[in-house]
Regions:
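Transmembrane alpha-helices of multi-pass eukaryotic membrane proteins
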Residues: 2-12, 56-67, 258-261
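Metal-dependent catalytic core segments for phosphate chemistry
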Residues: 187-233, 238-239, 274-277, 286, ...
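N-terminal organelle-targeting presequences
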Residues: 39-151, 160-162
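Reductase modules of NAD(P)H-dependent flavoproteins
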Residues: 88-93, 100, 105-111, 240-249, ...
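Classical protein tyrosine phosphatase
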Residues: 143-166, 263-295
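N-terminal chloroplast transit peptides
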Residues: 2-54
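Ferredoxin-reductase
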Residues: 100-105, 112, 116-235
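Transmitter module of two-component histidine kinases
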Residues: 196, 232-234, 246-264, 271, ...
Length: 412
């Protein structure tokens, strides 16, 4: 399936076949010989082979231990039903019948990595917390992960409660499994420096003595995020305490013909950069993906468009498979926004409502959201009327998407 800017997306889908799934009808991208619900046992980058294994290009030998035992009962002409029980292995979790790396390093026993490089990737804006950094860390191949997972970072402390070291903070990984350098020995994060100043937005706590903050000496209260400041202050060669990896909500399906709609706000772009580099950039996987991916990014200022050039270059190289659209809330207006008239992610999506609706109905399409919690209601704002126009109930439609594991959300 291709994405075209010059014609509706469904023109690029070819003849559509309506396929019944339960009590609802969905549009499939091509006529099918036999249709089943989307697979729930195939995760891109995961493995089921015991012994020496590779997680999305990061190889390691699994700890010796009992494996997962799966039993299946296949009714003639019916769907395969699987029942699996897993005996825990250190550093491994079974997710949908697949083994993925999991908590190889804990807060009590973190991996001692190091900073390879740090780059500020935003320009200054009127916001006090404008600075966002792309940080590459060396894990020596000891912390393998797959796209869509997270790692933890432990700052030296103290945190806002005076605890030393500070508590672990989880960050979505912004690199594909081989890492930005494709060595399988690095991991990248995109981190916003948290700064809260009384009188310039919300500021509940203060961890800077009044008058001592060099940037805001007159502020009554200033709070600087402990872990985000630690990461954004890193220099090449500095030590970093890493935990994880963890997380299974944002993993990609293994089907190379699956389609993805990615919705992100701010640093919620991280897991999608991980996925998109896997799909369109890395030597080990480039060219294998046959579906399409559509990225929507929402930010307050154009100076905050994270990895903007990277997405534009990717779109130019893969015009039929990848599309990139963004909403800049302080600079664009939308009549669809009845709250303040600003352009938010869902309002940008509404500009392509019918094209997106045809994709959302396709049982091969997965929807991913990462960032502000409001995106969930924004998704409903986009598609509830379209669902109901076809005689379905939105809550039931969404429940079906979740059951089919086509709806993936990490919001805060």
């Amino acid at each position: 399936m291709a994405i075209s800017r010059d014609a509706p997306i469904m023109a690029a889908l070819g003849a559509a076949a309506v396929v019944g799934l339960g009590s609802e009808a969905f549009v499939a991208s091509k006529p099918l010989q036999a249709q089943s619900a989307p697979s729930t046992s195939s995760l891109r980058g995961a493995t089921t082979v015991p012994g020496s294994e590779s997680f999305g290009g990061a190889s390691r030998t699994l700890a010796v231990g009992a494996g997962a035992v799966a039993t299946a009962v296949l009714g003639r002409g019916a769907l395969l039903r699987r029942r699996a029980t897993a005996v825990k292995k250190k550093g491994v979790r079974v997710v949908e019948g697949k083994e993925i790396p999991w908590n190889l390093f804990s807060p009590k026993a973190p991996y001692e990595g190091s900073c390879v490089s740090k780059e500020t990737i935003t320009s200054k804006t009127p916001l006090v917390n404008w600075e966002t950094c792309h940080v590459i860390m060396d894990h020596g191949g000891k912390v393998p992960y797959i796209e869509g997972q997270s790692i933890g970072v432990i700052a030296p402390g103290p945190d806002k409660k005076g605890e030393t070291p500070a508590k672990i903070r989880l960050y979505s990984i912004a690199s594909s499994a081989p890492g930005d350098d494709e060595s399988s020995k690095t991991v990248s994060l995109v981190v916003k420096r948290v700064v809260e100043v009384a009188g310039r937005g919300w500021c509940e706590y203060s961890n800077v003595e009044k008058g001592k903050d060099p940037e805001f000496p007159d502020a009554e209260k200033v709070y600087r995020g402990v872990c985000s400041s630690h990461i954004c202050d890193l220099e090449a060669g500095d030590d970093v305490l890493i935990t994880g990896p963890t997380g299974a909500e944002m993993l990609l399906p293994e089907d190379p013909e699956a389609n993805m709609i990615f919705m992100a706000t701010g640093t919620g772009i991280a897991p999608f950069r991980s996925h998109l580099r896997n799909l369109f950039h890395d030597k080990v996987s480039k060219g294998k993906f046959k579906g399409c991916a559509w990225l929507f990014l929402g930010v307050p200022f154009s100076e905050s468009l994270l990895y903007d050039e990277e997405w534009k270059e990717m779109q130019a190289e893969f015009p039929g498979q990848f599309r990139y659209d963004y909403a800049v809330s302080s600079e664009e207006k939308s009549e669809k926004n009845k709250i303040n008239g600003e352009m938010w992610v869902q309002h940008k999506m509404m500009e392509y409502g019918e094209d997106l609706w045809q994709l959302v109905k396709d049982p091969k399409t997965h929807v991913y959201m990462c960032g502000l919690k409001g995106m969930e209601s924004g998704f409903a704002e986009c598609f509830q009327e379209k669902v109901e126009a076809e005689g379905m109930v939105y809550t039931e439609f969404l429940k079906k998407m979740k059951k089919d594991k086509r709806y993936h959300v990490e919001v805060y």
